[in-house]
């Protein structure tokens, strides 16, 4: 391990020029990010950005696969290709990451398994901002280990894309942009489907997305609306005992953002998200053990931002109401609600959360400070306070030192509280999770590289997990009283030709390396999520320019996961084994407005699992064309 770190540091630092001003990356404080409620320029906290260039050229087809490009982001998939994925950060769980679309929160109160049911595809995305570390003082609930903000394009090129591949994979999409006066419209429709890489892993996904943007009398307005449908075979998704499962989800989403800039800036957001989940445990006999859930989330976020000589003052308030009706989750309803002629909702639950925010941002030459506190008022869990502070100091135009201290929290979701089945049992007495987060890091932009190193520590209390006690046959939710997680992250983006003063076809190399360690192990029980984090994650991505029109992009990654599982067929304990994955994409520009591509994932057909008893895809080849009109 020490040898790996030494090699990476040597490559990143030894050949670069400390005083050089012409960085290959953007200036340290150039990008507007989601790192504070004021949405001001600058990058005080540890924020990563996946750029448009990376999005367009990565050998991936989904947002979930793209997030693997961020350092210390763990993407555990069940069906692949965006069917269902759990996103976690820094050794946390998939319930502890906030997912946003243009700053609108989209986490699902039923279960985090559905949070990535997003109505957008890669074609609509401008960039992705990843805020690592606890961020409840900025975003409130769910931002326990970090937050991800997906930013869509203001103006999309009119285009048509078609692709196909192994396992009867088919995909098609249309993107259309037009303007009426100063009102800009983006409309996108796309669909993909496959028979699956094994029996029971078939899927069909449809996305519909609309965005309108305008400025009226100095007020910037952004309207988003989307609808997505997923139908998929859920082979062993939730239990290997009954592998032939099936699930169908529908997500409807709409939001309106109004922002008026000035010495006093008013920033307001209102949103609604509806999610329907239909789960069939026995696909061949859908009339038996058929679960229905419907969630509705209404949210309003208001901020007043005052500009000062040295920064900004911010006060804000968020009100969020979560509702669920179900035939499984919640308390008994006064009267059943009809779903169809044969099924009814018998249970339901709701809660309202109000968050009050105060934030102070100070910029004094090379010193930047962002401090604030969030008061969480929850109808079920009472009132709590979560303070935090982020500090950054620029030693030069190219070197920045940053540190932070933040308190974070997450309340249990409805599945953790109420779910009951032959193999799982929720717990209505669960407490909220809490954590204290500390980090220290350095960012260095040189002439031929952009490098960052971060050390972090998270002290967690009342961590929520699904646990199987040895000798028991039922997974149960419970709070783990104490769990401390520490780790470090290294990222270096290198311009090889500048570094070596050559003209090689491989122009850029990006290296990510992360290590996570927890002070608790699963002795005497199995942990479904909390203790099955990545121990280490190493990845290399490279861009190879064959000619002006032909480009090859490569990605190689190695994952080593903590914990293990019981193999269903043998009944034996199996440790998660480390594995390598290599993927590549060949793209060629033709006729000045079109691109054809060939993409291969898992090039060497390695066998691996993200979750026990759910095999992941082997080698998968796809090819396609995108025509810009």
PLM-predicted stretches and their roles:
Residues 86, 105-132, 150-151:
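Short acidic/polar hinge/loop motifs at secondary-structure boundaries
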Residues 363-368, 457-459, 479-565:
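Gram-negative outer-membrane beta-barrel transporters
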Residues 64, 68-104, 108:
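Extracytoplasmic beta-strand/coil segments of soluble accessory domains associated
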Residues 461, 507, 558-566, 584-629:
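C-terminal beta-signal and adjacent terminal beta-strands/loops
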Residues 238-262, 349, 400, 407-461, ...:
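Outer-membrane beta-barrel signature, preferentially recognizing the C-terminal barrel domain
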Residues 147, 152-178, 188-201, 244:
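Short strand-turn segments of transmembrane beta-barrel domains in outer membranes
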Residues 194-201, 205, 220-297:
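Flexible loop and strand-edge segments within Gram-negative outer membrane beta-barrel domains
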Residues 21-56, 94, 450:
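Short, acidic, small-residue-rich periplasmic hinge/interaction motif at the N-terminus
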């Amino acid at each position: 391990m020490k040898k790996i770190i030494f090699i990476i540091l040597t490559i990143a630092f030894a050949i670069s020029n400390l005083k050089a001003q012409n960085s290959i990356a953007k200036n340290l404080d150039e990008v507007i990010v989601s790192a504070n409620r004021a949405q001001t320029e600058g990058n005080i906290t540890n924020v990563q950005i996946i750029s448009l260039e990376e999005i367009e050229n990565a050998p991936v087809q989904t947002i979930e696969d793209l997030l693997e490009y961020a350092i210390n982001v763990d993407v555990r998939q069940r069906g692949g290709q965006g069917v269902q994925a759990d996103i976690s950060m820094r050794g946390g769980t998939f319930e502890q990451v906030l997912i946003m679309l243009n700053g609108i929160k989209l986490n699902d109160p039923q279960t985090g398994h559905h949070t990535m049911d997003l109505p957008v595809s890669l074609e609509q995305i401008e960039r992705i901002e990843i805020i690592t570390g606890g961020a409840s003082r900025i975003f409130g609930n769910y931002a326990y280990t970090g937050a991800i903000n997906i930013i869509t394009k203001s103006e999309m090129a009119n285009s048509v894309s078609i692709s196909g591949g192994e396992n009867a994979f088919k995909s098609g999409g249309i993107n259309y942009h037009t303007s009426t006066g100063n009102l800009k419209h983006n409309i996108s429709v796309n669909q993909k489907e496959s028979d699956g890489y094994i029996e029971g892993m078939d899927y069909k996904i449809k996305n519909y997305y609309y965005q309108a943007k305008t400025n009226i009398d100095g007020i910037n307005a952004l309207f988003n609306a989307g609808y997505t449908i997923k139908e998929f075979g859920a082979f062993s998704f939730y239990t290997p005992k009954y592998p032939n499962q099936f699930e169908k989800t529908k997500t409807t989403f709409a939001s309106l953002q109004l922002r008026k800039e000035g010495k006093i800036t008013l920033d307001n957001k209102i949103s609604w998200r509806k999610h329907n989940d239909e789960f069939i445990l026995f696909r061949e006999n859908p009339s038996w053990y058929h679960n229905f859930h419907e969630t509705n989330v209404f949210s309003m976020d208001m901020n007043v931002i005052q500009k000062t000589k040295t920064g900004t003052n911010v006060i804000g308030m968020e009100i969020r109401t979560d509702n669920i009706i179900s035939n499984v989750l919640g308390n008994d309803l006064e009267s059943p609600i009809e779903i169809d002629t044969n099924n009814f909702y018998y249970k339901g639950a709701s809660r309202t959360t109000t968050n009050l925010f105060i934030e102070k941002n100070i910029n004094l030459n090379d010193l930047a400070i962002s401090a604030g506190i969030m008061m969480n008022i929850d109808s079920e869990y009472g009132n709590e306070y979560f303070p935090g502070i982020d500090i950054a100091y620029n030693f030069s135009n190219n070197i920045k030192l940053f540190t932070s201290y933040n308190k974070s929290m997450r309340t249990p979701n409805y599945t953790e509280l109420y779910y009951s089945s032959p193999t799982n049992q929720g717990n209505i007495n669960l407490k909220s999770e809490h954590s204290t987060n500390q980090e220290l890091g350095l960012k260095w932009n040189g002439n031929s590289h952009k490098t960052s190193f971060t050390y972090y520590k998270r002290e967690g209390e009342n961590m929520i997990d699904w646990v199987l006690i040895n000798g028991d046959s039922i997974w149960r939710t419970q709070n783990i009283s104490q769990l401390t997680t520490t780790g470090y992250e290294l990222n270096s983006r290198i311009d090889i030709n500048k570094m070596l003063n050559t003209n090689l076809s491989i122009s850029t190399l990006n290296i990510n390396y992360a290590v996570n360690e927890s002070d608790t192990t699963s002795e005497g029980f199995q942990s479904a999520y909390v203790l099955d984090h990545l121990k280490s994650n190493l990845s290399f991505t490279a861009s190879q320019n064959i000619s002006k029109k032909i480009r090859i992009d490569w990605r190689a990654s190695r994952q080593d996961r903590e914990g293990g599982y019981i193999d269903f067929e043998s009944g034996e304990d199996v440790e998660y084994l480390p594995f390598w994955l290599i993927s590549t994409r060949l793209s060629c520009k033709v006729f000045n407005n079109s691109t054809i591509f060939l993409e291969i994932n898992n090039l060497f057909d390695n066998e691996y699992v993200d979750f026990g008893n759910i095999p992941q895809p082997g080698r998968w080849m796809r090819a396609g064309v995108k025509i810009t009109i």
